[in-house]
């Protein structure tokens, strides 16, 4: 049985070039994404306290994402890059989350888990690209370690969904959402941001 998510499209070279041209802004956005990822994991705990089988893993994920935020923040401090006072809206996340509206509470729960997997896998793919192309050795090492961690996160959300839903239902819906994510990511305006 597969747990990993295979994205339907790769990130473009134009996206990578945009990030490399303004890496300070990318770091600022990355820090905010890690903070939001931690909050998202805890929001599952708050919204679904009856799903006890996944709560320990959600808490562990939230802590790990918060540690990633701290690591990015420390990198920014060493490089003299401040946390921004205001972050841009994440159109990617807004469009993805719009796909989870409607349906029953159970299908929304399923879709939110699957969407979390897709988002983590997109982050993994992009962190890997950064690690392979950035010239700064410290940043290259950091992003190499980070993409391996994000790959694990992508897998755990699929595993969580499989605790509550049939394999066919999970993978059919996952395939639908992966295709929609590819459409969204391909249409995004280029900016030095994770999404």
Language-model-detected regions and their locations in the chain:
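Non-heme di-metal
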Residues: 1-195
């Amino acid at each position: 049985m597969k747990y990993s998510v295979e994205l339907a499209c790769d990130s473009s070279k134009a996206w990578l070039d945009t990030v490399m041209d303004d890496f300070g802004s990318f770091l600022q956005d990355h820090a905010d994404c890690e903070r939001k990822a931690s909050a998202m994991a805890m929001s599952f705990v708050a919204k679904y306290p009856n799903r006890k089988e996944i709560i320990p893993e959600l808490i562990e994920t939230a802590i790990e994402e918060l540690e990633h935020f701290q690591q990015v923040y420390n990198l920014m401090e060493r490089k003299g890059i401040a946390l921004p006072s205001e972050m841009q809206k994440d159109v990617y996340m807004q469009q993805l989350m719009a796909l989870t509206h409607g349906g029953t509470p159970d299908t929304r729960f399923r879709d939110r888990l699957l969407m979390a997997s897709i988002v983590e896998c997109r982050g993994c793919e992009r962190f890997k690209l950064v690690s392979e192309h950035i010239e700064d050795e410290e940043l290259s090492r950091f992003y190499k370690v980070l993409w391996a961690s994000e790959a694990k996160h992508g897998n755990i959300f699929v595993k969580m969904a499989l605790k509550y839903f049939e394999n066919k239902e999970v993978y059919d819906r996952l395939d639908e959402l992966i295709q929609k994510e590819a459409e969204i990511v391909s249409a995004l305006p280029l900016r030095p941001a994770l999404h």
